[in-house]
Amino acid sequence: MSKNPSQEEDEAMPISEVVIKRFKRLRLVFEPSLGVLGFFLVGLCLVFSFFYLDYRTVAKTKSHDFSDQSERFLWLKELDGFEVNNTKVGFLEESGNGCDLFNGKWVWDESYPLYQSKDCTFIDEGFRCTEFGRPDLFYTKWRWQPNHCDLPRFDAKLMLEKLRNKRLVFVGDSIGRNQWESLLCMLASAISNKNLVYEVNNRPITKHMGFFVFRFHDYNCTVEYYRAPFLVLQSRPPEGSPEKVKTTLKLETMEWTADKWRDADILVFNTGHWWNYEKTIRGGCYFQEGEKVRMRMKIEHAYRRAMKTVMKWIQEEVDANKTQVFFRTFAPVHFRGGDWRTGGTCHMETLPDFGASLVPAETWDHIKLLQDVLSSSLYYSNISETVKLKVLNITAMAAQRNDGHPSLYYLGLAGPAPFHRQDCSHWCLPGVPDSWNELLYALFLKHEGYSSPRSNNSDTDNFT
């Protein structure tokens, strides 16, 4: 067999040179394959990392699907703030007198929620999150647990009995309506014939109506809501006002429906969400004292002035021997990456934030202003002797519930909403406002002199 020139050339070379020459040839043959292999391995690593990151994202932001309750329970035990078998004194027991209801944490409770939205006809479609597409139910399973005492389990029949022949009135903005609808559902859960709970003027619940009065027929009691987002009167400006003044807030005059609240047995105020630039000056709403429009008055000063008017009205117009007065503090919003107008979102939030408070600085400013007004009113006007005003200080507890908002699911059958127009201000029902009403229930029972040998899970006249 004849040899080719390459073989003859190899035989004429020393063995070491032959090895080197053949190695070089081998390298040339495999170089493209090694490049392809390297590219393949790098690509595989990238794909794996994407799957890993996506898994972490899903684990943090999506609803968790557990095979059974025990698996879910074990997972929840790992969460910060989750506590099991924490035996505490009952709030309504004698030894629970010094307990602060608002110093506590959110704990998982499989017995919640207290009602289902599909069973309650009183809920605005904007709060029916689960019925209109929200995929998770975790937000309905959290109960507020004070650190040093247990709240009484909400008993709708007991509260209705205590409300017999009485009026319970909510006055405030749409977050107040949120809480009012929550209490209607909580109480109606004890009524088998829902036709015996009705609006006395046959008005359907809508955010455009000024007030609603719902009667529980068998108990001759009413649970009412009056829309008054500023609590003081918003009206036409005085003659001769600048053209840009469309309306004014009369800081020395209560809302026109105030006469309807005066004789309530329980009166629950709230305000705050409308005391901002968007809801006032941007829309041509300025502040008025007497007949003078204060064009340069800051919103914070106007808010303080209005709250003093509210405190003065409570002192002078409310019968302290009959009426319990509560003031619920500001419930924070949880927009991320913007606000209502600029594309803020909250739809990825499915668990409470057990860490640091998310309360923004402007919210604390509202709280500080209210605290200052209450403190000065108590000090200078002897209001403590005439009105037993209690503060439902829900700001810190609500700040942790970034998971509780309607987000995309507030448009009913027309939803979900556009991604850039989410609702991270109001609350899904059932949900966070139920806990505010459980606090109201506990303080109401305390006032009524009710005591129980054992509670489910504190009374404070001011901020702690």
Swiss-Prot record:
Location of the motif GDS motif: 172-174
Motif (DCXHWCLPGXXDXWN motif): 423-437
Example of a GO cellular component annotation carried by this entry: membrane
Main location: membrane
GO molecular function terms attached to this record: O-acetyltransferase activity
InterPro entries according to UniProt: TBL (IPR029962), TBL_C (IPR026057), TBL_N (IPR025846)
Coiled coil: none
Subcellular compartments: Membrane
Transmembrane regions: 33-53
Topology term for the membrane: Single-pass type II membrane protein
Keywords: Membrane, Signal-anchor, Transmembrane, Transmembrane helix
Functional note: May act as a bridging protein that binds pectin and other cell wall polysaccharides. Probably involved in maintaining esterification of pectins. May be involved in the specific O-acetylation of cell wall polymers.
Family, similarity comment: Belongs to the PC-esterase family. TBL subfamily.
More info: Contains 2 motifs that are conserved in esterases, but it is unlikely that this protein belongs to the catalytically active pectin esterases.
Name the record gives this protein: Protein trichome birefringence-like 11
Organism: Arabidopsis thaliana (Mouse-ear cress)
Gene label: TBL11
